[in-house]
Amino acid sequence: MPSKVYFTRNIAPESVLKLYEACGLELSGNVAVKLHSGEKGNQNFLSPEFWRPMIEHVHGTVVECNTAYPGSRNTTAAHWQTMRDHGWSDAFTVDIMDEEAPDLQLLIPNGKVIQKNCVGKHLTESGSPSSCAQYRHVRHICSLHRSGHHS
């Protein structure tokens, strides 16, 4: 069953909470909130203060993984520095999920192109993974996507 994705054109912390309520779900356990923390020198991310009401509402932990491309988040040390520079680690509990090797390998049954996916092994500590993403298309649009439980 495909996931539902909710959008809003009103870019405000209150709108994010309304999107969460529209999902009709209560996240439980250790709630992992995946978002874009921003690259060094780039202002194209929504600040910790923007996300504060949502993250506090679900008692969440901000989670990310190191990037596979050059930048300020491609090593754990650089990623932690970026999290500090952008205020994330001061505002919330943060978990860089692939900080410790090896990655967790998830099998994809009947995968046509990919048969396994490597993810940060801290994913197993999350009772409710969720993703908060921002998109640009004509205007800035914000979405909240509930990814569901993993096995």
What kind of feature is each model-predicted range?
Residues 1-151:
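N-terminal and secondary-structure boundary signal
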